[in-house]
C-alpha cells in the first residue's frame, strides 16, 4: 500500500503528456517476474512509478516497529483467528496486547511507526493478524500524545481491512477519519476501490467513487482513470466501459484511459470490442502509444492470431511508434510456450536489430526456451550474459533452470546453481524453495530439506500449500507423527491455508497409528470449526 501511495502522489505531480508517464504500463509483464503465476498485462495508472518511497524512520523508530510487530505476531501465534471468522467490532481492544504495547519504551508512537507496523502485518499472504492489527491501531490512535494529522495509518488500516474483505470496517475507518478531521483524499478512496475490484465487487467500487464527494473529496481525472484501470485489470471490461461512457463527457479521456479500456476487453477475451475502442481512440485524435499496441499484440498472440499480431506490429512501426521490450516479450511468449525455440530466437534477433534492449523477462524467456530444448549449456550462457550486462536476475530466472535440474535429478547441479544464485545476490522465493526441497526429498536428503525450511523461515519467505504438503508428506513417510502434526496445525491455524483432504487423512492416520487419539479428535474438531470438513454423521 505504501507503493500505491507513492505512485498516486507522483501521478498527481506528473503531466499526463510527460515522457515519464508511459512507465504507467511498465508492469505489463509482471507474470514473468513471478513464475507466470499472474496474468501479464498489469498496466495501470497506479503503476506510474516502480520504486516505493519509504517513510523516513529513525533507527530508533525502526526498532520500535519491529518490537510492536513481534508482539503482534506472538499473540497471533498463540491465538490464531481467521479475519473472516466474525464481523469485527471496530473499537476492538485486546487487554493483554495493550499491556504488552505499553511496556515498549518510546517517547511517542508516531504515525509513521503505526503505518509501518500495520503494513508489515498485512504484507503476508496467509495468516493475517487482523484482530491484533486493529487492536494495535486503536491502542495507538487513542493515546493522548498521538498526532491525528497524518492519514497514512488510517489508509493502511483501510487497505488491510479491504484485503480481508472487511469492508464495513473500512467504511468505519473512513467515518472515523471524518470525525477526527483527518484528511480524506483520493488516495483513501483509491485504496478501497482497488480492494473492492480485487474482491470481484465492481458495482461497489463504482459506488465508492460516487461517494467521494460525501466526504469532501472531489473526484478528478486521476480517480476516473484509476477506477477504469482497476476494473480492466480484473477483466471487468463491461463495467469499465459503462463507467467510462457515463463520465467521459465530465473527464476528458486520454491515452491512458483508452489503453486501459483496450486492455480490459483484451483480458476479457473480447478482441472485437478492444478493436472498437482502439478505433474510437484514433477517431478522438488520440494516438495509441507503445503500451496500447503491445497490449493488442499480446491479446492476439494469446488467442492464437499470431499473423494478425505481426500485422499490428507492422502498423506500429509504420506509425512511427517504437516498440519496447514489452512488445517483443509479448511476441516471444507464445513461441516459448509452444516450444518453438527457433521462432523465439528470430524475435530476439529482430529486437536486437531494432536496437531494443532486452530486459529481465526477455532473458527469462530465452532461458525457458533453452531449458525446454534440454539445452542447459545455452540457458546458463544467457544467465551469464544477464549477470555480465548487470541486467537484474530474479527468482524466476533461476527457477526455470532449477526445474530442469530437478527433472534430471542432478542434486549436485542444484547445489552449484544455488551457489551461483547467492553470488548474484538473488533472493529465492517460495517456488525456489519448493523445487529444491522436493528434489532433496526425492534424494532422501532430509537434512537439506530442513536446512531449506529453516532458511525460508529466517528470510521470512512465506510457505504455501505445496510447501506444507511436501514437508508433511515427508514426515509422515518417516513415521514422525509429531512433526507432521505440528506443521499441519501451523498450516491450518497460523497460515489459514486449506489442505487437501488426502493430506488431512494422512495426518489422521499417523495420529491413530501413534495412539494419539486426543490430538486426533482435536484436529478433527479444528477442521470442522474452520469449515474445511463436514462433521461425521
UniProtKB/Swiss-Prot annotation:
Matching InterPro entries: Pentatricopeptide_rpt, TPR-like_helical_dom_sf
Alphabetic keyword roster: Mitochondrion, Repeat, Transit peptide
Ranges for the PPR repeats: 150-184, 185-219, 220-250, 254-288, 289-323, 324-358, 359-393, 394-428, 429-463, 464-498, 500-534
Name of one Pfam family that matches: PPR_1
Transit peptide: 1-32
Source superkingdom: Eukaryota
Cell compartments where the protein resides: Mitochondrion
Main location: mitochondrion
One Gene Ontology cellular component annotation held by this UniProt entry: mitochondrion
Family: Belongs to the PPR family. P subfamily.
Matches recorded under NCBIfam families: PPR (TIGR00756)
Full protein name: Pentatricopeptide repeat-containing protein At1g20300, mitochondrial
